[in-house]
Amino acid sequence: MSDARNNRKVYRGRVVSDKMDKTITVVVETTKTDARYGKRVKYSKKYKAHDENGEAHTGDIVEIMETRPLSATKRFRLVDIVEKAVII
């Protein structure tokens, strides 16, 4: 049982929205190698993550971890705020 818990996906991304109550939207940018030409192509994906205390704000770099379904679209939870956004 503990092995299944340790195999959860952990992603690092940037918060693009914190307007919802206890929910943040995180963009995870990664690269994929093109099958035909071998060129590395950037792509991004948005995930909704549970933020219990409302700690993360737009622009922060965060780590999110896979968890049980918390709502119709939420499958991740906030683990750590790696870097706070600089507000000018």
From Swiss-Prot:
Source species of the chain: Levilactobacillus brevis (strain ATCC 367 / BCRC 12310 / CIP 105137 / JCM 1170 / LMG 11437 / NCIMB 947 / NCTC 947) (Lactobacillus brevis)
General function of this protein: One of the primary rRNA binding proteins, it binds specifically to the 5'-end of 16S ribosomal RNA.
GO CC terms in record: cytosolic small ribosomal subunit
Similarity remark: Belongs to the universal ribosomal protein uS17 family.
PROSITE patterns reported in the protein's UniProt record: RIBOSOMAL_S17
Subunit structure: Part of the 30S ribosomal subunit.
Gene Ontology MF term list: rRNA binding; structural constituent of ribosome
Protein name per the record: Small ribosomal subunit protein uS17
Gene name in the database record: rpsQ
